[in-house]
């Protein structure tokens, strides 16, 4: 299979999409089919007390029978009463870790005869990626990063190399965590685009099956290699009902009406002081956020000074050094840094990229050690917005 496929594959229109049903054992054969086609397959697995993306070669490593419990500042795994393969919501990782990695060596240099010789480093993966278990909010996050790193004025060649030709197997959410709010953001829980295949897991008296939707021609080709039967109207109704139930389970929401103007008009709201008293500026929220894209560049040398490397690493607007310029730091308080992050995510992102930078995954709530809840911060500002006006 060619490794230089364009990022945007030819998709099947909604009216042409084909639905089929496969039994649970076919998931292992799906992984094998993707491997045969030359993909390096990544999927969910349990590691260090969390469900994370990692390289998989079979269905054995999937989180069978596990679910997650999430609340502000809390994440725990627990056993389910069934053998669901995807019976969880989201872990701390997203596809950002693979498409826009935490660190990448840009180039290295060696000193020879008194001068440095630049050595370019290969940043393109040896095989294209295939991702299994991608949620609707994560698909939306990839679309956001595409807009930022591929479609903006400055194209990121490293992101393009890693994004190109990626095969995406989405999994429709059939349950929600207490920190999810994708329904209010219009980003889930149903995946509607951006996938090659979408699975809806049905576990119950009817057995353990998956309703499969082909979102691209190559997705349909892969399903053709598996044992499947056409989905009936009853199958489709059950799948739709399961996803609708996940939307109803969500207990958090952001009222997005006029949110850009709301935040722009409330720079001096007392809530910013309140949240600053709780924020640790640890940058957890930006590390787990699937859309945050800020990086820094560092040059390192060995002790002899004969070898040097330039690395690009994730950075965060919560660190003091991020906003340091000649003469001082323009955001030297937790108040200023949190306000910058939330206002950018929910307001100025729209001016830059034409859409919100938040997909409602709830990771910033779950993984904040102080339990700060972005939905509550927005609500507090909206309810007391007169305080922020001059």
PLM regions and their residue ranges:
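Active-site-flanking alpha-helical
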Residues: 142, 290-294, 369
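A donor-sugar binding/catalytic signature common to diverse glycosyltransferases
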Residues: 284-300
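Residue-level detector of anion-binding/catalytic polar loops
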Residues: 40, 285, 364
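Single, functionally critical "micro-switch" positions that shape active/binding sites
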Residues: 37, 282, 361
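General structural feature for long, well-ordered alpha-helical segments within catalytic domains
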Residues: 26-30, 285, 313, 373
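Iron-sulfur-associated redox domains of electron-transfer enzymes in respiratory
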Residues: 2-264, 269-272, 303
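Ferredoxin-type iron-sulfur electron-transfer modules in oxidoreductases and energy-metabolism complexes
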Residues: 256-277, 295-390
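Extended amphipathic alpha-helical segments enriched in small hydrophobics
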Residues: 276-286
């Amino acid at each position: 299979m060619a490794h230089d496929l364009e990022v945007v594959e030819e998709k099947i229109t909604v009216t042409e999409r084909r639905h089929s049903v496969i039994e649970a054992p076919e998931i292992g054969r799906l992984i094998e089919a993707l491997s045969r086609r030359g993909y390096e397959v990544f999927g969910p697995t349990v590691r260090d007390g969390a469900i994370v993306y990692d390289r998989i070669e079979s269905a054995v490593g999937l989180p069978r029978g596990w679910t997650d419990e999430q609340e502000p500042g809390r994440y725990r795994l627990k056993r389910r009463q069934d053998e669901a393969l995807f019976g969880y919501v989201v872990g701390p990782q997203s596809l950002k870790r693979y498409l826009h990695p935490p660190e990448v060596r840009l180039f290295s240099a060696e000193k020879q005869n008194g001068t440095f010789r630049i050595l370019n480093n290969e940043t393109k993966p040896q095989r294209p990626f295939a991702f299994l278990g991608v949620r609707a909010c994560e698909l939306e996050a990839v679309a956001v990063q595409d807009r930022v790193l591929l479609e903006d004025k400055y194209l990121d060649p490293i992101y393009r190399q890693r994004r190109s030709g990626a095969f995406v197997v989405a999994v429709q959410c059939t349950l929600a965590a207490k920190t999810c709010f994708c329904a209010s953001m219009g980003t889930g829980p149903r995946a509607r685009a951006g996938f090659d295949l979408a699975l809806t897991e049905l576990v119950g008296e009817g057995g353990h099956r998956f309703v499969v939707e082909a979102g691209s021609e190559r997705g349909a080709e892969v399903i053709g290699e598996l044992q499947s039967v056409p989905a009936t109207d009853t199958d489709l109704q059950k799948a739709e009902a399961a996803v609708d139930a996940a939307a109803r389970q969500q207990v958090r929401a952001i009222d997005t009406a006029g949110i850009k103007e709301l935040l722009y008009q409330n720079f001096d709201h007392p809530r910013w002081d309140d949240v600053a008293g709780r924020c640790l500026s640890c940058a957890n929220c930006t590390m787990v956020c699937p859309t945050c894209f800020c990086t820094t560049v560092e040059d390192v040398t060995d002790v002899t000074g004969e070898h040097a490397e330039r690395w690009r690493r994730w950075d965060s607007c919560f660190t003091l050094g991020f906003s340091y310029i000649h003469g001082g730091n323009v955001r030297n308080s937790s108040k200023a840094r949190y306000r910058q992050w939330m206002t950018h995510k929910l307001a100025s992102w729209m001016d830059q990229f034409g859409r919100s930078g938040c997909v409602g995954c709830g990771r910033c709530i779950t993984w904040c050690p102080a339990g700060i809840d972005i939905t509550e911060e927005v609500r507090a500002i909206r309810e007391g917005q007169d305080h922020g006006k001059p």
